[in-house]
């Protein structure tokens, strides 16, 4: 029996029957990953322009990023933009995560007919084109003078991150036995305490909103600027107004950081299970 004729599962499906699916998956992964990976060697180029493949290798653009605070022109202060993005992303965690988690918990335990109505409303920011959300936020913030403010950025990013948290937590709760919480309550624990000590630890690794906020660009373009410009907004403007290879260095750092956080999250999630 050849390798392609071996059974893939107990349903008698053979590897040959799925070969086309594996090939298609490899092609899709290639098209998704390779364009992102090209930016990595470009970040080590010594050229003044984005160049692939690099003719000469250098760390000059990483140095330009980490020491950009020494540049008098605020447009090139990448570190200030990075600090703003980190601050907004952390604050978004404390806004979007509790709201999304409690909403998911309430919907998962609800037997009301309103559940079918509330869920689409809560995930509507994901369904509506993000450009429309950004325009709406801009005109709303103008009325309250919240444009270019940290609070405005946090609320805007939370609006986008909350539906993602809601969906992920609801998915995690489907695999969670709610009887564990009922047992805790029968032993004298209050409902909030049972949720915090029994339910929350088993779904905590499904709570992600940091990366959603850190990578967000559309809302940032409309409601941030000046001293409160985010790193993604600064990258977009630099790519539009000038060819700065520092963007490739920052992109490489973001790719490595995001991938590392996702891997750690998956490892911790698997370990907790």
Walk through the language-model features, giving the residues of each.
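A structural signal for multi-pass alpha-helical bundles of membrane permease subunits
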Residues: 34-47, 84, 134-144, 153, ...
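Membrane-interfacial helix termini and adjacent extracytoplasmic/periplasmic loops
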Residues: 50, 54, 59, 114-116, ...
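C-terminal transmembrane helix and the adjacent membrane-cytosol boundary/short C-terminal tail
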Residues: 1-10, 20-23, 170-185, 191-192, ...
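N-terminal, non-cleaved signal-anchor transmembrane helix
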Residues: 1-83, 264-273
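Interhelical loop and adjacent transmembrane-helix boundary motif
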Residues: 13-18, 47, 59-73, 214-264
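Membrane-embedded alpha-helices of multi-pass transport/permease systems
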Residues: 34-37, 41, 98-102, 118, ...
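Faces of alpha-helical transmembrane segments in polytopic inner-membrane proteins
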Residues: 31, 92, 99, 122-132, ...
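Transmembrane-helix boundary motif in ABC transporter permease subunits
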Residues: 3-14, 89-122, 135, 139, ...
